[in-house]
């Protein structure tokens, strides 16, 4: 018995020694690997590298902004709770930019202040592009408290975290809905803000918070008030894919494509009694590629202690009926159109004067052909009938 035990003990010791040796070797190999560091590259500032936090980066506009930032060699962290965004869009971006230190995704809700502060404490951000928001006018009239919480309160949470962790640049995604229904057109940045729906009111409150804070801060602030967004990535990599339950609140382009694909029986145009030439609303439709370009130019031009406020639009108003005809032409589909009563909270006419952003940021909308923008978006929709689920 003693003899047997004495033979087993060295064997056990030997195995233990080998295991320790292998563990040490693995640690050495990992430490020598270029992808292994004791702290993430996202947690430290690097000379020549600008790290941008993109809130809502899994959404339609945020994902397109992330694509442009990555293409321009920015480091990007996306924070999104995926309530309106798509993980599929994030995966597309991850496949396009797989290199370490380029892109990270963090699942979090901006309504959770502890989570937001943890994110800021663990990452070295140089700037924030704040897109995350619920953004449907009709829905805002049905769920106003949700909009004030999601837009106004969450913006305050982000701003407080930026102040606490010394993040000095904010590019804020605002909206022409803050103007309401002005007496004169086109809308300039000096046009009085009198929003008429909870979406516009919540955005204006968020703007006011940012502006009040900026008065006693060296933060560089850019507020972009943009108009009706259409189009998609010309390279066909990203598109708009709202959740099925949100389609009734979505953009007119999405409804038009759904009708062309046969997902819905036809297109519903709400309101034909507006005081416009053909009775339908007039809007300024801005291509998402141009919109993203405005954000990047704003980031580049942002100055410490300064606030820039800009309208982002084409400067041309198009009626809903004009839009529908352009959509029919782009899709080649025979789309049934039903005319219904007005949607609560909508306004008759709104289009921009983009002179200020042209003069100060050297930005001009380039994708101004309505049919071409819709054709680009239609190609993505046809290739992805189930959104990113068919990617």
UniProtKB/Swiss-Prot annotation:
Cofactor list: NAD(+)
Enzyme Commission number(s): 5.1.3.5
Family: Belongs to the NAD(P)-dependent epimerase/dehydratase family.
Residues binding NAD(+): 51-82
UniProt KW keywords: Carbohydrate metabolism, Golgi apparatus, Isomerase, Membrane, NAD, Signal-anchor, Transmembrane, Transmembrane helix
Subcellular location: Golgi apparatus, Golgi stack membrane
UniProt topology in membrane: Single-pass type II membrane protein
Keyword Membrane included in the entry's annotation: yes
Molecular-function GO terms, alphabetical: UDP-arabinose 4-epimerase activity; UDP-glucose 4-epimerase activity
Residue ranges that the UniProt entry lists as topological domain Lumenal: 31-391
Protein name per UniProt: Probable UDP-arabinose 4-epimerase 2
Membrane-spanning ranges: 10-30
SUPFAM superfamilies associated with the record: NAD(P)-binding Rossmann-fold domains
Any single Gene Ontology cellular-component annotation: Golgi cisterna membrane
Any one GO BP annotation for this protein: UDP-L-arabinose biosynthetic process
Organism the protein comes from: Oryza sativa subsp. japonica
Pathway: Nucleotide-sugar biosynthesis; UDP-L-arabinose biosynthesis; UDP-L-arabinose from UDP-alpha-D-xylose: step 1/1; Cell wall biogenesis; cell wall polysaccharide biosynthesis
Active site residues of this protein: 199
